[in-house]
Amino acid sequence: MAKRKVPAEFVVERDDYKCIRCLACVRVCSYGANYYDENANRVYTENYKCVGCHFCEAICPTEAITVRRNNFDIRPLAHWTPEHLIGIMKQADTGGVLLTSMGNDRPYFSYFDRIVLNASQVTNPSIDPLREPMEIRTYIGRKEAKLEIEEDGEGNVALKTEIAPQLKLEVPVMFTAMSYGSISLNALLSLARAARTIGTFFNTGEGGLPKELREFKDNMIVQVASGRFGVSADYLNAGSAVEIKIGQGAKPGIGGHLPGEKVTEPISETRMIPVGTDALSPAPHHDIYSIEDLRQLIYAIKEATRYEKPVGVKIAAVHNVAPIAAGMVRAGADYIVIDGIRGGTGAAPKVTRDHVGIPIEFAIAVVDQRLREEGIRHMASIVVAGGIRNSADVIKAIALGADAVYIGTAALVALGCHLCQTCYLGKCNWGIATQDPKLTKRLNPEIGARRAANLLRAWAHEIKEILGGMGINAIESLRGNREALRGVGLHEYELKLLGIKPAGEAW
């Protein structure tokens, strides 16, 4: 029987006139796609090995290389795309689950792109952020319903109400949970240093805490997931907050999976598992099967941290996200994290990543509204994630009801990621999603930190510009202010769920 060949996804084109046979592309490709033929004195590429990371293209000194998508031409069939056919061929070969990485790449609607912002004109003067102060500082944590002040006989006043622990963000953007193992130590160090420079936070993810990150405790959130890798009382007290991960947007309802190829000696020590074994996180926490169980864990962590740190809970955005979020707040969560269908991952079944969950825009709106209706919105902050691409997405998310956002993919792109979606292989040529020492050294954490900090610094400038144009001088005035938003080309029921009006409709 003739075997049907799986076509290459990418084609590497090489200008033989420009190529000087330096063999840099041969040496640097961790996938072994490029090779040199001494007899012909030419460099060739086995295109089926290319993942489209563009590293060879970037390091070629004469710009002789171009990597492009391979047009897999078949008889035009709307229902059977090349992606479907390639998936069937791979599964027929292996009998296995198709794995992938990064975020959902399906052509679903991006609702952020169908939402526009307001601006001040004539009757409500705009504000120049270069000449007037703009407040974008954000506090994450439980707020009090009211503040009580006490006064002594001499007219001095003091705050009587005890304030719950808060995370102070100088910009309403944090670096999301990415574990040591899924990404390299140099990548984590880049984000940690950037967070300290800007005055925000990074999240360790579920992979435990390498000793190199301990110095960043004032800008670090530690995570407790179902695998409980590296979790101890010392770990819980090592950061500024603790986050319980129930689910994530890229793979709702299933656990985590770090392939054994990525479990090196340092990862083994940090996660407390044998070298080379797959690190599997169960789908559920085996001590959480109800809101009451979640409450027990939240307060166990609060006891272990002496009630000095905010405790958050992270879930994926699913159909009944609003009542779940309300239950989490009533269970004692100081902040909740909602991760949408565009959320990224180091490894996930392709079918789950592409088809499970809901867009983050709807999740923000319905959760914020539900908490307001129940009168508990002040009891927890809302942090959202899953496809935040730029400062406009940040502003729209906050106007829909979020307090702050997490970014992951955008941060990795700042470090050099080219979204080749093969993080799970552990061969990242850019030194990000790999544990190979020969590859990780390609990412300089000092340069990475500078680039990640530059990204947040640029977004902060843009957020201030937009706020000033709206006539708003504090981000508090934008939070949940859906009158500042209008929908373009959205159906009536979509506008109703988002809580916004169509473009052209005045106040």
From Swiss-Prot:
Ranges of residues in domain 4Fe-4S ferredoxin-type: 10-39, 41-70
GO molecular function: 4 iron, 4 sulfur cluster binding; glutamate synthase (NADPH) activity; metal ion binding
Biological processes, Gene Ontology terms: glutamate biosynthetic process
Membrane-spanning segments: none
Residues that bind [4Fe-4S] cluster 2: 29, 50, 53, 56
Reactions this protein catalyses: 2 L-glutamate + NADP(+) = L-glutamine + 2-oxoglutarate + NADPH + H(+)
One Pfam family in the UniProt entry: Glu_synthase
Signal sequence bounds: none
Binding of [4Fe-4S] cluster 1, residues: 19, 22, 25, 60
Origin: domain of life: Bacteria
Cofactor(s) the protein requires to work: FMN
SUPFAM superfamilies the UniProt entry points to: 4Fe-4S ferredoxins, FMN-linked oxidoreductases
Presence of keyword Iron-sulfur: yes
UniProt family annotation: Belongs to the glutamate synthase family.
Protein name as catalogued: Archaeal-type glutamate synthase [NADPH]
Organism: Thermotoga neapolitana (strain ATCC 49049 / DSM 4359 / NBRC 107923 / NS-E)
Upper taxonomic lineage: Bacteria, Thermotogati, Thermotogota, Thermotogae, Thermotogales
